[in-house]
């Protein structure tokens, strides 16, 4: 298992609020919690930036982290990420913040310590470009937006 540096920015983490952990041996994501002093009420269409009380430093340029929505919050309550996905670069060292958007039709209350998103680590490939006039022919070519069929 890869070791990532974690800085606790709020004393409640690890005491009142659990440290991020994998729910099962097969889990890809670690739950991130709302590190709030009081509940936050999100009206329909509203977006708020929610602190997690944590900072990470991945350090390895071959890795990044993504902040992803929790499927149950999105499906049942319309609570998703305001930026759809958060990308955490390997050299970032600031607090992890979660942009939470209520795309639903009713207000939703986020409680202190509530699980609001998940953190997934992923490999990174940094690419360089080779400028060309034409590409080698492929089966797909320039076809996009459904050109490969519906089913």
UniProtKB/Swiss-Prot annotation:
Q: Fetch the Pfam families from UniProt.
A: dUTPase (PF00692)
Signal peptide: which range, if any?
Answer: none
Tell me yes or no: is Phosphoprotein among this UniProt entry's keywords. no
**Keywords of this entry:** Hydrolase, Magnesium, Metal-binding, Nucleotide metabolism
Q: Which cofactors go with this protein?
A: Mg(2+)
What InterPro entries does the database record attribute to this sequence? dUTPase, dUTPase-like, dUTPase-like_sf, dUTPase_trimeric
A GO BP term, please? dUMP biosynthetic process
Q: Name one GO molecular function term.
A: dUTP diphosphatase activity
Q: Would you identify the family this protein belongs to, as annotated?
A: Belongs to the dUTPase family.
Its recorded name reads: Deoxyuridine 5'-triphosphate nucleotidohydrolase
In its UniProt entry, the species of origin is given as Tolumonas auensis (strain DSM 9187 / NBRC 110442 / TA 4)
């Amino acid at each position: 298992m890869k070791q990532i540096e974690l800085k606790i920015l709020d004393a409640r983490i690890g005491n009142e609020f659990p440290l991020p952990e994998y729910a099962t041996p097969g889990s890809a994501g670690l739950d991130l919690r709302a590190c709030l002093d009081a509940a936050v009420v999100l009206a329909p269409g509203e977006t708020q930036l929610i602190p997690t009380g944590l900072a990470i430093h991945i350090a390895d340029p071959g890795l990044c982290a993504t902040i992803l929505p929790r499927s149950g919050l999105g499906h049942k309550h319309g609570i998703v990420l305001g930026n759809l996905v958060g990308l955490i670069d390997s050299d970032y060292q600031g607090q992890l913040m979660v942009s939470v958007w209520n795309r639903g039709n009713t207000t939703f209350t986020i409680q202190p310590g509530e699980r609001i998103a998940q953190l997934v680590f992923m490999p990174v490939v940094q690419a360089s470009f080779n400028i060309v006039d034409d590409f080698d022919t492929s089966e797909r070519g320039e076809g996009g937006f459904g050109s490969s069929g519906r089913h």
